[in-house]
């Protein structure tokens, strides 16, 4: 009997080895030499000063698809090839998010649309169908009233904070306040623009920098374990006391508490089918059994954290670029004096598009091949990849490809969105590779309204001494930090002058 088990075990090992060595391999793909079996390139990517600099160097050397090392000797394909990205995100056969991306996002947003993949079929379709009316044209018009009210409070708050007519202001602090207060559309006022300090707002200010600055080798390895551990034991990692997991769970618990308070303060549905804001829609879905309480909490958590953080960060980078290129502020003011319809202002929209291109709020997205597949590449070639292959889909690199955007792809030039049609279409907005395409119209309207109000009332410029602004590496959201002051969290000091 023992001999029989030895034979069976040997046969199983032989079959496993045969499958392993016969499976498609990406070892032949060029890329930077791996620095460590245990850490690959994950440590050097976290240690770089400016997110994207190292990846840009590799892209110039190895092209729009290259191989880098992950933890435990894993091969990770870095992808910014337009054809390959179109294939990965195609709605008919989407690649799912990687297990570590889903796990990390789930810690602070729950199982809302932020992590429910299109490949999950019925769940994704059901959630999208329920939430779509919240982003209808009628609801967007209602939202614009809220955007305007909050942007007016923002303008008044900045003015009242001045001792004179100009001052150096941490713009990141104010953009965070206004985008959080816009959540007052839930009929739940955070009042941060009125000086109220909420526990959640304070925690989110340092959400990504505090938890992900200078990670130890052990912390990187523990997070990388998520990619290879079976789902049945992933929950145990919540008990692992890494800074990142501790911080994200803490913020997630605050967001969940806030989501419950929001729903508890909302009365039963009083609007007819097809009308009402997001809260009405979620309450209606709960009342008819289409959504459970944990799903509703997750949608609110996603909007509170992910929606607030992405919008606030995008506005911050936009104001930074307009401070650097201050001559563009006068062009926007001239447009605003001629029209009150934001969509009819070409330069206002061009600077928004250009800022989202240069500063995608999410640097990259980690996805996994659901099966052995042929990945189409630009130029007509294909690459065979194995099931389970990890792909790092880089929005940062794609949005700076010279073959798409021209020789000045890494420079600020809003005119590119005025002068020519774009050659391919990956994103739903201006060919940009961006997160949360399903709520992009709402996000753009929010940016238009706030930017217009700020530009009409203030002039932005770089402060004395011009501190160096860096893109914080290692964070899922690319937040600005001041060189040498990363420990203070996300910041953007600008000189702000009140216009007469």
Which residues are covered by each model-predicted region?
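Conserved cytochrome P450 K-helix E-x-x-R motif and the immediately C-terminal K′/meander segment
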Residues: 44-59, 63, 340-379
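Cytochrome P450 heme-binding "Cys pocket" and the immediately downstream C-terminal segment
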Residues: 193, 326-328, 428, 440-484
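N-terminal membrane-proximal hinge/A-helix region immediately C-terminal to the signal-anchor transmembrane segment
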Residues: 3-112, 117-126, 141, 145-157, ...
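Conserved cytochrome P450 K-helix/beta-meander segment immediately N-terminal to the heme-binding cysteine loop
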Residues: 393-424
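C-terminal helix/juxtamembrane-tail motif
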Residues: 484-500
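Cytochrome P450 heme-thiolate monooxygenase catalytic core
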Residues: 97-108, 142-315, 331
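Short, small-residue alpha-helix embedded
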Residues: 310-323, 450
């Amino acid at each position: 009997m023992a001999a029989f088990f030895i034979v069976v075990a040997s046969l199983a090992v032989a079959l496993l080895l045969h499958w392993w060595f016969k499976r498609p391999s990406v070892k032949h793909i060029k890329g930077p030499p791996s620095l460590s079996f245990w850490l690959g390139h994950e440590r050097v990517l976290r240690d770089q000063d400016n997110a994207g600099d190292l990846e840009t160097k590799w892209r110039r050397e190895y092209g729009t698809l290259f191989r880098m090392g992950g933890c435990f000797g894993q091969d990770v394909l870095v992808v910014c090839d337009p054809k390959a990205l179109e294939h990965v995100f195609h709605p008919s056969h989407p690649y799912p998010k990687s297990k570590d991306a889903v796990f990390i996002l789930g810690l602070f947003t729950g199982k809302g649309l932020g992590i429910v993949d299109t490949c999950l079929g019925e769940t994704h379709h059901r959630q999208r169908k329920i939430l779509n009316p919240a982003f209808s044209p009628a609801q967007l018009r209602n939202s614009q009233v809220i955007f305007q009210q909050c942007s007016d409070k923002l303008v008044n708050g900045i003015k009242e904070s001045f001792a004179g007519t100009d001052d150096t202001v941490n713009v990141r602090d104010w953009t965070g306040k206004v985008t959080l207060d816009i959540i007052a559309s839930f009929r739940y006022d955070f009042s941060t623009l009125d000086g109220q300090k909420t526990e959640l707002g304070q925690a989110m200010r340092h959400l990504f920098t505090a938890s992900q600055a200078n990670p130890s080798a052990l912390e990187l390895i523990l997070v990388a374990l998520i990619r290879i551990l079976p789902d049945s034991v992933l929950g145990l990692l919540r008990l692992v006391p890494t800074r990142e997991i501790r911080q994200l769970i803490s913020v997630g618990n605050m967001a969940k508490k806030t989501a419950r308070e929001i729903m508890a303060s909302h009365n039963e549905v009083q609007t007819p089918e097809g009308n009402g804001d997001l809260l009405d829609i979620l309450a209606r879905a709960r009342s008819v059994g289409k959504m459970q309480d944990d799903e509703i909490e997750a949608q609110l958590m996603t909007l509170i954290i992910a929606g607030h953080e992405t919008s606030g960060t995008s506005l911050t980078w936009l104001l930074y670029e307009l401070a650097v290129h201050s001559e563009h502020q006068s062009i926007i003011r001239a447009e605003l004096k001629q029209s009150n319809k934001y969509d009819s202002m070409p330069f206002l929209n061009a600077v928004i598009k250009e800022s989202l291109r240069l500063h995608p709020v999410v640097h990259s997205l980690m996805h996994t091949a659901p099966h052995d597949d042929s990945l189409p590449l630009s130029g007509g070639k294909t690459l065979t990849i194995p099931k389970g292959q990890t792909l790092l889909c880089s929005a940062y690199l794609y949005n700076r490809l010279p073959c798409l955007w021209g020789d000045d792809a890494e420079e600020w030039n809003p005119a590119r969105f005025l002068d020519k049609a774009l050659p391919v279409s990956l994103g739903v907005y201006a060919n940009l590779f961006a997160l949360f395409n399903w709520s992009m119209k709402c996000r753009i309207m929010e940016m238009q309204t706030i930017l217009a109000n700020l530009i009409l009332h203030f002039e932005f410029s770089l402060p004395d001494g011009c501190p160096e602004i860096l893109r914080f590496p290692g964070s899922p959201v690319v937040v600005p930090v001041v060189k040498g002051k990363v420990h203070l969290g996300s910041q953007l000091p600008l000189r702000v002058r009140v216009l007469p």
